[in-house]
Structure formats: C-alpha cells, structure tokens
Regions:
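Active-site-proximal loop->helix
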Residues: 228-241
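N-terminal secretory signal peptides and thylakoid transit peptides that target proteins
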Residues: 2-18
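Active-site alpha/beta core segments
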Residues: 85-188
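C-terminal segment of N-terminal export signals and the immediately downstream linker at the start
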Residues: 25-47
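Short amphipathic alpha-helices and their capping/turn segments at secondary-structure boundaries
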Residues: 48-63, 95-102
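A charged, well-structured terminal subsegment
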Residues: 247-261
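Short Gly/Thr/Asp-enriched flexible loops that form oxyanion-binding sites at enzyme active sites
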Residues: 204-214
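A short glycine-rich beta-strand->turn/loop micro-motif centered on a GG-aromatic cluster
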Residues: 194-198, 216-230
Length: 261
C-alpha cells in the first residue's frame, strides 16, 4: 500500500469536544450531513461473502479488537484532533458493537489496542524514523501530554472490564507482530475477529489482512471505523470488502448476533 508520509498523523490540534450525551445525535447526523463516509460508505457485501452465514460465523469463538481509538483522535487538544472523529460517528457505533459483543457468550477476548503517535522510543528502521518524525513535527508535548494522548477515549474506557487486554501496536500497521495478540487468540481458540477503529485504510486494513493470512475470519464494522478524511472511506471499505473481510454496519452486527441468541 502506498500512503503519503503524513497521511496517518496530521497533527493540527483543535477539534472541539462534545458531551457524551450527544453521542447518539452525532451518530445520526455526522455522516448524514455530508452523505460522505461513515455508514454511507459501507458497500454491499461482496458476492463471495453472500455464500456464508455471517450469523453462524459470528457465533463461533470470537475476539473483539478496538484499534487506535484514543484521545489523540477524539478529544480536543489531541495530536490528531483536526480529523474531527468525535463528530463523525465511529465512537457511538463502537459503543454499540462492544455492548452487543459483551452480551454474546462466545466473545471471550476483548482487546483495546493503542497506537502511539509519539514513537521516538520505538524500534524503527530508517523508513520508520522519518515517517514517525513527520507525524509529530512541530508539536511540543510533555511526557504527560504524550501519555494522555494515547489514552483510550473516555467513552470506551468506561466499557473496559477486568480480564480485557490493553496494549499498543508496535509495528507500523498490525497488532499481529510484536504483541501478545497471537498468543491470546491461539490460547482461546478464536476463529472470528471483529474490528473497529482508526485508521480504516491503515491499521484496520492491516489487521484484517494479517488476520486472514493467519487463518482467522475478520469482520470489519464500517461505521465504527474511519479514515483520516471521510471521502477516503468508500474506497477503503470497498477494497477491504472485496478482498479481505466482510464490511458491515454496527446495526447489522447487532442484528446478526441476535439471530443466534
């Protein structure tokens, strides 16, 4: 995949935060206002997925993965707040997915995976070094500010339970390298993986590809994910849906789970 060096981490701070009580309103209006991105970008299922019973697939031993849904992207003052994800609907859709998965007895692995934008202390190649530096160029964050930037956003922090896994991605775009995730999935005999998070065309696609190659059945919740820009989401969802994993909405996920309850 070819991405502009700065496409993942545009670092202009300043998107205004909204109250948690407005989440449901945001879900209905954020994408609808422009008709671009979010739930509007979810394509019809690719023909091959129509051969499967997705409700049955979702009834198998399953894991949930939230990737890079941190304060950096959702909260005012975050290094990536200019992308305005709080206003774009992925957060309430994610809450809907997590609440439904918690009620399903076959979901026995919940993974909250951070992605630090400040990566000066990470192992890095020459490509990594210049790319990581470009994400935070011009920012003057203290160590405490950097830590807070990578904290799980508050609405999702409230959903974390004892026994959940919290760790950071260490590779460029996947949690399947350099983390405990492969061992977690193997020990719990996971078959199906449900993905939400940011960025859709980076870590979500990267993890969906890695999951497929490792023999898992990934399903991407389109409206619980987002690209840097809404207009990038339709192409990303179409690519993922055509080649790597079914892309469905949060509402469809809830509906499919209810068929097996």
């Amino acid at each position: 995949m070819n991405f502009p060096v700065t496409s993942r981490r545009q670092t202009l701070a300043g998107a205004a935060a909204i109250a948690a009580t407005s989440l449901l309103v945001a879900e209905k209006t954020a994408s609808a206002a422009t008709g671009v991105g979010g739930i509007n970008a979810i394509p019809p299922l690719a023909a091959q997925w129509g051969e499967l019973d997705l409700a049955e697939i979702l009834s198998r031993p399953a894991a949930y993965m939230s990737v890079s849904q941190n304060k950096s992207l959702y909260d005012a003052g975050g290094a990536q707040a200019s992308e305005r994800h709080r206003e774009r609907g992925s957060l309430p859709a994610t809450v809907k997915v997590v609440n439904a998965a918690r009620k399903a007895s076959n979901f026995n692995s919940f993974n909250w995976i951070g992605y630090e934008v400040f990566r000066e202390n990470y192992p890095q190649s020459d490509f990594d070094r210049v790319q990581y530096a470009s994400w935070t160029k011009g920012l003057n964050f203290t160590p405490e500010m950097k830590k807070q930037d990578n904290d799980l956003v508050g609405e999702l922090r409230a959903l974390v339970r004892p026994g959940d896994n919290e760790f950071n991605e260490l590779a460029l775009q996947t949690a399947f390298a350099g983390t405990q995730l492969p061992l977690e999935l193997a020990r719990k005999k996971i078959q199906t993986i449900v993905l939400t998070g940011i960025h859709l065309d980076w870590c979500i696609e990267g993890n969906a590809r890695a999951a497929r190659d490792a023999g898992y059945l990934p399903i991407v919740i389109g409206d619980a994910c987002a690209c840097q820009k809404p207009e990038q989401e339709a192409a990303a969802m179409e690519r993922i849906n055509n080649f790597f994993a079914p892309v469905i909405s949060a509402d469809r996920f809830v509906e499919l789970l209810s068929k097996r309850s």
